[in-house]
């Protein structure tokens, strides 16, 4: 039986590519996305690329009750890859409370639900912004964490601390945090790539 993975933000740029790779590697994938910056059409394109249609639920990770029901609907989820987040540095300066609510509460909800539903691991999509203005280039994993320069960056730093504290408390969770820089490009098929809703609407 295939291992089941939950991908939050799975219709986004990085999420959709990850879903394709997971399916090509033999995993059963469930996507959760509120479609705030993407389209359900991405699910169709994922199917065209991989030949497999992933399960998709339009749902906000802030909805604790809804997420609880999702884990019940899709039993046996082994791990979560958590991409769902508000992600624009400039917007985070203008709307800090939106970013703190979306980015912190969504993670907390997942961490609270994981032990209840026997989910063993989470990969958290952090960011290079946790390094602030680095002293030395290129930046390595050993670079010190600096004061965040935006609410967005601060949410990523706080989320990392939440994960560390949760694991240190004895919670039965394994966690990996990815601090990557801005990804670019598109799938060779050109069926999935970066196309935020605002840009898509501008070209209609």
Put a short name on every predicted segment.
Residues 2-79:
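N-terminal Rossmann/SDR dinucleotide-binding element
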Residues 15, 90, 132-133:
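Glycine/Thr-rich phosphate-binding loops of Rossmann-like dinucleotide-binding domains
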Residues 31-32, 58, 124-126, 176-179:
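Short beta-strand segments
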Residues 38, 86-90:
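Active-site beta-alpha loop architecture of Rossmann-like, nucleotide-cofactor-dependent enzymes
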Residues 78-81, 123:
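N-terminal Rossmann-like NAD(P) cofactor-binding module of classical short-chain dehydrogenase/reductase
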Residues 84-87, 126-127:
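Conserved NAD(P)H cofactor-binding loop of Rossmann-fold oxidoreductase domains
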Residues 94-112, 116, 121, 130-182, ...:
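Catalytic helix-loop patch of NAD(P)-dependent Rossmann-fold dehydrogenases
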Residues 202-204:
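Conserved small/polar residues in nucleotide/adenosyl-binding loops
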């Amino acid at each position: 039986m295939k291992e089941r993975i939950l991908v939050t933000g799975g219709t986004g740029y990085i999420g959709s590519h990850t879903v394709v790779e997971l399916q090509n590697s033999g995993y059963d994938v469930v996507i959760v996305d509120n479609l705030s910056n993407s389209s359900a059409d991405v699910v169709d394109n994922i199917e065209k690329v991989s030949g497999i249609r992933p399960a998709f639920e339009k749902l906000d990770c802030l909805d604790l009750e809804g997420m609880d029901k999702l884990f019940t609907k899709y039993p046996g989820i082994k791990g979560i890859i958590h991409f769902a987040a508000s992600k624009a540095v400039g917007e985070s300066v203008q709307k800090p409370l939106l970013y703190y609510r979306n980015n912190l509460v969504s993670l907390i909800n997942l961490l609270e639900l994981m032990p209840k539903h026997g989910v063993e691991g989470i990969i958290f999509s952090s960011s290079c912004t946790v390094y602030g203005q680095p002293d030395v280039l290129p930046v390595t994993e050993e670079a010190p964490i600096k004061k965040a320069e935006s609410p967005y960056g601060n949410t990523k730093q706080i989320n990392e601390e939440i994960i560390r504290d949760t694991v240190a408390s004895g919670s039965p969770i394994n966690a990996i945090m990815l601090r990557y820089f801005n990804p670019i490009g598109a799938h060779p098929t050109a069926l999935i790539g970066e196309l935020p809703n605002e840009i898509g609407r501008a070209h209609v």
